[in-house]
Structures are given as structure tokens and as C-alpha cells.
């Protein structure tokens, strides 16, 4: 099995394809021009398709991933508004595209070849709609509204139409700016990074008498007891074992490591690491061995070895990327 890392470079208008070797070394094997600023990229594993959001023409380009991890363009599809985040439902029949600038989320069915059709639903007035992530256990789409300090909650119907849950939405702290959302492997807890106040919210998800309840159980700062005059937090990821959570901040140029409490899934600050300049995104490889950070300003990536016992990071490699790297994801072939 070979691990492939894909990096979206907005200013260079391309996607880079890298091999990640078992020892943490990397090698660039392909650069694909995107004819526009590429931002979010997301992969459906079963069909080996990569989807890339392109601006300013507001498109999603579908690429086929071959046996070596290389990309071949298949089709372009139109989406409403500048794409900021691409995700899918658990059956991988529907594509969700968030648009921060258009304040909307769209739902596009995928045809038999995995190509997005025209949207069947567009929900407007989600101010600062930054990300959407599907919880398969509860059949709920979590949609972050950065400008309104809230997360909208929608059930997904059989035909792909989103319907408000009984709770409709949950609020984060005022002027916090919820940006990205992830789920614990057990799907009963969600973690959101707040861009504007440099914090993480932990949410407990449950159902009582078939009614969904999402409840905030913790808010914790990225710097523990230290205080910064400004925050610009960006990305959040959890190891697949559910033990270690990492959060990046572009103003602090840092990665914060938290330990996940196995009893209640709250998090405990452990350590902060200085990293690439303006670390907009990072990913954890499929084996939880490496964390790879891209610097939007440094135009470089750093590879960190993850300690399996503590989650601590040790920098082992650094490479030059294209200009303005905004997104990174991994794939196992």
C-alpha cells in the first residue's frame, strides 16, 4: 500500500501529487494545472475520485485517481458561489459544497460515474458558511456559520434534501467564528475550531425519544493559560484512534496538541508547536504516523513524526510547494 498526498496551491493554480514513504520522506510525482484558484479538495475512496473546488468561475472539477495516485481530469460542474469546503454523505451519493462568500450550502447528487449533477437544493442566508460535515450515525449535516457564531443542523432525507432538525442550530460563544468541524470516531462527539477567538468547542451528540440533541460540554483555548491579542485559527484534525487532537492557527503560526479524555471525550491542552508561516491546513496520514502542515505564506510543507504514546510531534522533513497552498489531503492506494 502506498500513501499519496494531494496539495491544492491557489496562487499557482495547481494540484500537487506527492508520495509519502514509510520513513516520512516525500516525493513530488505530478503537478496538475487547474485553470483557476483551487481551494478545497476531497476524495471518495471507493470510486477513487478527487473533487476540487475552483474559483472565480465557481466550479468543482472531478479527477480520476489511477493506480499510482496520479490525477486525470474527468469533468467540470457548476456550483453556486465560491467553493470553500466539499464533503459527502455516508452513502457517497450527494456532494455538499459550502460557500463562505455566497452564504450558502448546496446539495448536488452524484451520477453513476461520480460526477456532480446540478444542485437539487441551495440553502441561503447561512452567513459565513465555511464548512459542512456529515455525521453518519445520526444522519445529520453540521454546517458552520462563522459570521453568526452558530452551527446549523440538518437531517438528510432519502432523496438528498436537507431538513432542519428539531434543534435547528447551536450557538458558540459570541465573536468566536466556528470554522471547521470534525467528529470523534464513535460519532457521539463533535469538535469545532473557532477562528476568531482561538478556541475549540466540544459537543455531545445524542438522541432522546428520536429527537436529536447537540450540547456544548467544553470550550478550551489553543494556548492553555496564555493569551494572544489576536487569533486566526484554521484547521482541526483528530487521529483515527481518537486519542490526539490537533489545531492550527495562522496568526500564531502554530499547531496545538490536545489529549482526548477517554471517559468523556473532552480535551486537555498538552503542547504547542511553532510551524510553517500561516498554516492554513494540515492532514494526518492514514496510519497516524505523520502530520503534514502546509504554510500558505512560506510555500512549504513540514512533515512531523507522531509519537504513538503521547501524540507529540517531531519535525523530520520540509519541502517546497507551489504558491499559496490552501488544502491538503491523503489517500491510500
UniProtKB/Swiss-Prot annotation:
Per the record, what are the reactions this protein catalyses? 6-phospho-D-glucono-1,5-lactone + H2O = 6-phospho-D-gluconate + H(+)
Return the broad EC class.
hydrolase
Q: Which Pfam families match?
A: Lactonase
Biological function: Catalyzes the hydrolysis of 6-phosphogluconolactone to 6-phosphogluconate.
Describe which pathway this protein belongs to, using the record's wording.
Carbohydrate degradation; pentose phosphate pathway; D-ribulose 5-phosphate from D-glucose 6-phosphate (oxidative stage): step 2/3
> What HAMAP family does the record tag this protein with?
6P_gluconolactonase
EC number(s) reported in the record: 3.1.1.31
Supply the InterPro entries for this chain.
6-phosphogluconolactonase_YbhE (IPR022528), Cycloisomerase_2 (IPR050282), Lactonase_7-beta_prop (IPR019405), WD40/YVTN_repeat-like_dom_sf (IPR015943)
Please indicate if the UniProt record lists ATP-binding as a keyword: no
Alphabetical UniProt keywords: Carbohydrate metabolism, Glucose metabolism, Hydrolase
Q: Which GO terms describe its cellular component?
A: cytosol
GO MF terms here are:
6-phosphogluconolactonase activity
Q: What is this protein called?
A: 6-phosphogluconolactonase
| Family recorded in the similarity comment | Belongs to the cycloisomerase 2 family.
- Keyword Hydrolase in the entry? The reply is yes
Origin species? Buchnera aphidicola subsp. Schizaphis graminum (strain Sg)
Report the leader peptide range.
none
Q: Name one GO biological process term.
A: pentose-phosphate shunt, oxidative branch
Instruction: Supply the source organism's classification.
Output: Bacteria, Pseudomonadati, Pseudomonadota, Gammaproteobacteria, Enterobacterales
Q: Which Gene3D superfamilies match?
A: YVTN repeat-like/Quinoprotein amine dehydrogenase
Amino acid at each position: 500500500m502506498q500513501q499519496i498526498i494531494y496539495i491544492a496551491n491557489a496562487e499557482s493554480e495547481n494540484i500537487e501529487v506527492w508520495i509519502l514513504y514509510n520513513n516520512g520522506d516525500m516525493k513530488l510525482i505530478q503537478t496538475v494545472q487547474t485553470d483557476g484558484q483551487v481551494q478545497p479538495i476531497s476524495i471518495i475512496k471507493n470510486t477513487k475520485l478527487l473533487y476540487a473546488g475552483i474559483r472565480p468561475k465557481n466550479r468543482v472539477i472531478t479527477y480520476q485517481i489511477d493506480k499510482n495516485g496520479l490525477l486525470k481530469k474527468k469533468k467540470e460542474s457548476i456550483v453556486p458561489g465560491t467553493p470553500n469546503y466539499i464533503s459527502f454523505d455516508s452513502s457517497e451519493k450527494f456532494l455538499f459544497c459550502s460557500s463562505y462568500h455566497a452564504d450558502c450550502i448546496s446539495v448536488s447528487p452524484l451520477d453513476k460515474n461520480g460526477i456532480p449533477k446540478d444542485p437539487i437544493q441551495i440553502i441561503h442566508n447561512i452567513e459565513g458558511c465555511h464548512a459542512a460535515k456529515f455525521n453518519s450515525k445520526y444522519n445529520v449535516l453540521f454546517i458552520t456559520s462563522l459570521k453568526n457564531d452558530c452551527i446549523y443542523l440538518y437531517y438528510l432525507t432519502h432523496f438528498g434534501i436537507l431538513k432542519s432538525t428539531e434543534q435547528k442550530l447551536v450557538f458558540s460563544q459570541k465573536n468566536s467564528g466556528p470554522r471547521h468541524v470534525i467528529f470523534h470516531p464513535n460519532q457521539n462527539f463533535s469538535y469545532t475550531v473557532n477562528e476568531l477567538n482561538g478556541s475549540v468547542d466540544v459537543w455531545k451528540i445524542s438522541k432522546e425519544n428520536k429527537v436529536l440533541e447537540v450540547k456544548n460540554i467544553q470550550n478550551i483555548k489553543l494556548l492553555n493559560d496564555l493569551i494572544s491579542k489576536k487569533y486566526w485559527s484554521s484547521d482541526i484534525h483528530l487521529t483515527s484512534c481518537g486519542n490526539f487532537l490537533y489545531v492550527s492557527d495562522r496568526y500564531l503560526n502554530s499547531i496545538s496538541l490536545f489529549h482526548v479524555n477517554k471517559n468523556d471525550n473532552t480535551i486537555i491542552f498538552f503542547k504547542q508547536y511553532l510551524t510553517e508561516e500561516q498554516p492554513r491546513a494540515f492532514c494526518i496520514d492514514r496510519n497516524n504516523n505523520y502530520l503534514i502542515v502546509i504554510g500558505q505564506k512560506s510555500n512549504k510543507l513540514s512533515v512531523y513524526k507522531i509519537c504513538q504514546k503521547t501524540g507529540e510531534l517531531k519535525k523530520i522533513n520540509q519541502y517546497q510547494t507551489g504558491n499559496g497552498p490552501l488544502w491538503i489531503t491523503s489517500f491510500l492506494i
